[in-house]
């Protein structure tokens, strides 16, 4: 066997110590390179204040739903007109 190190009273092989050192270094580096989340916190707080004041945050989604419904109704009306014209032609 080769040399081994004693860490906190346990015998640790050199390759395990090297791998754990690389992992710890990568973890610390990634922790300090992440950007703070101050922008997201500001957005969340404004959404909470809108909900508390009674304003609906889903108003845009409801407007989009209305547009989709109108589009579907228009498509169905056009389809009915086309089928009527086809039946009259036959």
UniProtKB/Swiss-Prot annotation:
Organism, per UniProt?
Saccharomyces cerevisiae (strain ATCC 204508 / S288c)
Alphabetically list the UniProt keywords.
Glycoprotein, Membrane, Mitochondrion, Transmembrane, Transmembrane helix
One GO biological-process annotation of the entry reads: proton motive force-driven ATP synthesis
Bilayer-spanning residue ranges: 15-34
Q: What's the protein called, per UniProt?
A: Uncharacterized protein YOR020W-A
Mainly resides where?
mitochondrion
Composition bias of kind Polar residues appears in: 43-60
The keyword Nucleotide-binding belongs to this UniProt entry's keyword annotation: no
* Glycan-linked positions: 44
Give the subcellular location.
Mitochondrion membrane
Q: Which GO terms describe its cellular component?
A: mitochondrial membrane; mitochondrion; proton-transporting ATP synthase complex
Q: Which InterPro entries match?
A: ATP19 (IPR021278)
- Could you tell me the superkingdom of the organism this chain comes from? Eukaryota
